[in-house]
Regions:
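Hydrophobic transmembrane alpha-helices
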Residues: 11-82, 89-90
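Juxtamembrane non-transmembrane "cap" segments at the membrane-aqueous interface
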Residues: 160-187
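Short helix-perturbing small/polar motifs within transmembrane alpha-helices
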Residues: 19-36, 45-55, 115-165
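Conserved small/polar residues in nucleotide/adenosyl-binding loops
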Residues: 208-215
Length: 220
C-alpha cells in the first residue's frame, strides 16, 4: 500500500512539474501581452483566486446521470479568471493551491484520485483557454478559448479517466473495475463498461462545465 501511495505521489509531482513547465513555455512564446506587475501583487491575486476556488470546490453538485464519485463544482471560474488576468503560469499555480486548500478544509473521499483529476483536467481546460485569450484579448477569443479548452478537457479527460484514473481508483480502494462500472449502471442502464462510463458520465460533464463558465467571458 505504501509503495502504491508513493508511486501515486510521484506521478502527481511529475504531472504538476510538466504542466507548470508547459504553462511557462506558453507564457514566454505566445502570451506577449502580459502586464508587468509587482510580485507581491501577483501573489495577492493568486491567493485571492485560489481561496475563492477552494471555497467553491467545497460546494459540490451531484450529477443525476453519473455515479456518486463524479461531482461538479464552479471552482474553475476563479482559476480561469486568474489565468486570463495573470497568465497561464498563475492559472496552473491557482489550480494547485485551490485543490490543496480544499484538501485542508475537507480532506479527500477518493484517496486523492478525484483531487488529482480535478487539478489535471482543470489545467487542460484553463491552459488552452488562457493561451488563446492572451493571443488577442477580446470577448470573442475568451469564448473561443473556453470552447477549445472544453474540447481539450473532454478528449483528455475521457482518455485520462479510462486509462489511468478509474484503474487507479480501483487499485487504491481494492475494488474490481466491474464494481465501479456497476455504480454507473445503477444510475444509467447504458453504462456497461469503462468506455460507456466515460461516454455517459465524463463527456456530459464537460458540456455542462462550459455552460456554467460562459459568464467568465463577460468579466474579461
Amino acid at each position: 500500500m505504501l509503495k502504491e501511495n508513493l508511486s501515486f505521489i510521484g506521478v502527481c509531482a511529475l504531472v504538476f512539474a510538466a504542466l507548470l513547465g508547459l504553462a511557462y513555455l506558453f507564457e514566454r512564446t505566445v502570451c506577449h501581452d502580459l502586464q508587468r506587475r509587482s510580485r507581491s501583487r501577483n501573489i495577492s491575486y493568486v491567493a485571492m483566486f485560489s481561496a475563492l476556488g477552494g471555497v467553491l470546490m467545497l460546494l459540490e453538485i451531484p450529477l443525476f446521470f453519473a455515479p456518486g464519485f463524479y461531482k461538479m463544482d464552479l471552482s474553475e471560474l476563479p482559476v480561469l479568471m486568474s489565468a486570463f488576468y495573470l497568465g497561464p503560469v498563475a492559472g496552473v499555480i491557482t489550480e494547485l493551491l485551490k485543490v490543496l486548500l480544499k484538501l485542508l478544509l475537507k480532506g479527500t473521499s477518493t484517496a486523492f484520485v478525484g483531487d488529482f483529476a480535478n487539478f489535471v483536467v482543470g489545467c487542460t481546460f484553463v491552459l488552452p483557454a488562457a493561451v488563446i485569450y492572451h493571443h488577442h484579448k477580446t470577448r470573442r477569443t475568451a469564448i473561443v478559448g473556453m470552447a477549445v479548452g472544453t474540447l481539450c478537457m473532454t478528449v483528455f479527460g475521457s482518455l485520462f479517466n479510462a486509462l489511468y484514473l478509474i484503474p487507479k481508483f480501483a487499485e487504491l480502494f481494492h475494488l474490481p473495475i466491474d464494481q465501479i462500472v456497476a455504480m454507473g449502471t445503477a444510475v444509467n442502464k447504458g453504462i456497461t463498461s469503462v468506455p460507456t462510463l466515460v461516454l455517459f458520465a465524463v463527456v456530459p460533464v464537460s458540456y455542462t462545465h462550459l455552460r456554467a463558465h460562459e459568464t467568465c467571458a463577460d468579466l474579461v
